[in-house]
Regions:
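Residues that cap or initiate secondary-structure elements
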Residues: 28, 42-44, 53, 100-102, ...
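Generic marker of residues within folded, mature protein domains
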Residues: 12, 82-84, 132-136, 153
Length: 171
């Protein structure tokens, strides 16, 4: 009987050591409270006028001049002189490029102001609302048509005209 108790005692000791060793060798590692932050940076979204703008005449605007100037990446000006009669028209094209590395751009339809609608019609034939420019080089054109719709009789007529296109970032 003593022998039996001795064998049982040895078995219990071996099992206890095995369980104890297993409990000591397991370690759980946790990571808590860490976070990743990605910040919006306006420098990641670059849509601008590209290269030189162009223009064409319609009608017979002899002696007319058009001056196009890009004052910076997002502002351009034009001056049209010498249009004289109904039907004289100038079409101006401003190339737009998306220089963003990873973001696409969605263009809104141009908004136009014209303070002399009696003598001048101004329309934007492009871009259409929702025009999407691919990242890293997608292009579109802002095309403006300025037309004399009534022949001036007694005084020279002028108009102050603006056009704006809003570009929104798209993933």
């Amino acid at each position: 009987m003593k022998k039996r108790y001795g064998v049982i005692a040895v078995l219990i000791a071996v099992i206890a050591l095995g369980v104890g060793y297993a409990a000591i060798s397991n370690v759980t590692l946790n990571v808590n409270g860490s976070q990743a932050t990605a910040e919006a940076d306006q420098d990641n979204f670059v849509v601008k006028y590209d290269a030189e703008s162009t223009f064409t005449y319609t009608g017979n605007p002899t002696g007319s001049t058009v001056t196009l100037t890009r004052t910076n990446d997002t502002n351009a000006t034009f001056t049209i002189e010498g249009l004289t009669k109904k039907g004289d028209k100038v079409t101006i094209t401003y190339p737009i490029i998306n220089a963003s590395e990873t973001l696409k751009a969605s263009l809104a339809a141009p908004t136009i102001t014209n303070d002399n609608t009696e003598y001048f019609s101004v329309t934007a034939t492009s871009p259409a609302a929702g025009t999407e420019l691919a990242a890293n080089g997608g292009t579109a054109n802002l095309v403006l048509e300025v037309e004399v719709i009534k022949t001036p009789v007694t005084d020279d007529e002028t108009a102050n005209i603006t056009a704006a296109v809003v570009a929104s970032p798209v993933q």
